Amino acid sequence: MTDLPPMLQWPSARLMGAQFVAFDQDTLTAEMAFTPPPEFANMRGQVQGGLLAGPMDEAMGAAVFLATQGKLQLTLDINLSLLRPVPLGRITVKARAVKTGSRVTFIESELFDNGGNLCARATATSMTTDWPGAKPGPDA
């Protein structure tokens, strides 16, 4: 077993070069950094737009995980607005659990390039779940 936070052990996080930066308990905001691999580049040498959804979804999942004391999330929908091209290199995503309910959580995130420029925004709705194999609760 490793001492890494669970969200950094997920295969998708490893693929995107994820690093956990911080979690603010007061605002339920998780900050993660990613280093997309060269294979994420489009023909212009920038990160392909659709692939930016991955780090944003990953950070939103981390925000839900931390805001709900360890629940997993299944993304039901995600809306991504691309504001500017993202060069290959380190990116930072700040994701906030806006409202957590017993089953549904609303999340928002912002993605910044290595220069601190806001490059994308996303909102998502997710369903919180227990870890696979967990025994169902009384209301399952």
Question: Where are the regions that the model predicts?
Answer:
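Terminal targeting signals and extreme-terminal segments of soluble enzymes
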Residues: 1-140
